[in-house]
Amino acid sequence: MKTYDLFINGQSVPPQTKKYFDSFNPFSGQVWAKIAQATAQDVDDAVQVAHHAFSEGPWSTMTATQRGLLMHKLGDLIARDAKELATIEVQDNGKLFAEMFGQLNYVPQWFYYYGGLADKIEGNVIPLDKKGFFSFTRKEPLGVVAVITPWNSPIMLTAWKIAPALAAGCTVVIKPSEFTSASILHFVKLFEEAGFPPGVVNVITGFGNEAGTALVEHPLTKKITFTGSDSTGKIINQQAAKFLKHVSLELGGKSPNIIFADANLDDAVNGAVSGIFAATGQTCIAGSRLLVQDSIYDELVQKLVTLSKTAKMGDPMSSDTQIGPVTTRPQYEKILSYIDIAKNEGAKLLMGGEVATRPECGNGWFIEPTIFGDVNNKMRIA
């Protein structure tokens, strides 16, 4: 079984307590790896290293052009290893290989773009109406950026956050979800190969109430960027506010599709099905609500259920699979609880609504594609 340590100052480092926690493969439901459980002391080590790299190390003296070239090299390495990284993500979060591989082929573009932008971050000269005064602005890196990412698209969402930070000259400490840390720990090894100095990119793994809190409240982290749940986002915002830190939050959504009578219903149904069941519905922009004009409601529901019943569930590594398992056991149980809530509140179950027991689902965390009708805004699922 694979064991993953922390990544600090360009090296794999065991946690000071030598404690590790289990990482589960959602398709098998079995433990497949052990992940280091960071403490506040481990977090401090990572932040101190990142701060040193920012203020005194080689990174601090690099030109913007040099940073950009390193980022371009990194993009090439990600493209080279996209298949391997995507395979690890599938083991870790159970999403379809086709989706993960597609994301990994897109990620290099993010580093190419921001690598090209690095030497174009410019200030302005501001005209004044007073003689003897000269006014200008310059843009400077903040320092250490704390990057906290979710379990649904680990590498892609991490890249979205760290690429602009690195282009600006910041250093980063990444805290991935405790459910999907392995791919990030593979990913950051590429920074060393690309030529990034030690300490520029660091990873601490563990739980939010320990490692996450220590990272957000550390006096040397100057910006917090987080993608995840509303509830955790509120906690992070409150913690960061005590220190007046810069905060960027990307939180959950409840996205509606609105379908009117003049729409092409076949196209609308295709879009609605892919919008909710892609990624097993585990995205912040999943189209989890349909607002349908009364005159086409019955026809659209029939088409929607008919198409949804054709979805193939199973091994996320198979090219034939259309719906994979739920990524985490807590999320799996939460979805089932909301199905029960919907039934109890009077929503009409149109299909699904139960654990998937198909042979191809094995012991994984699968739930049948589920659709409710006759839902109103007072119901919790809405």
Language model feature labels by segment:
Residues 68, 72-75, 79, 101, ...:
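Short amphipathic alpha-helical segments with heptad-repeat character
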Residues 65, 88-96, 126-131, 252, ...:
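Short linear capping/connector segments at secondary-structure termini
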Residues 32-121:
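Glycine-rich loop-to-alpha-helix module at the N-terminal edge of alpha/beta enzyme cores
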Residues 231-376, 380:
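ALDH superfamily catalytic-core signature
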Residues 29, 67, 89, 111, ...:
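Residue-level signal for inorganic ion chemistry
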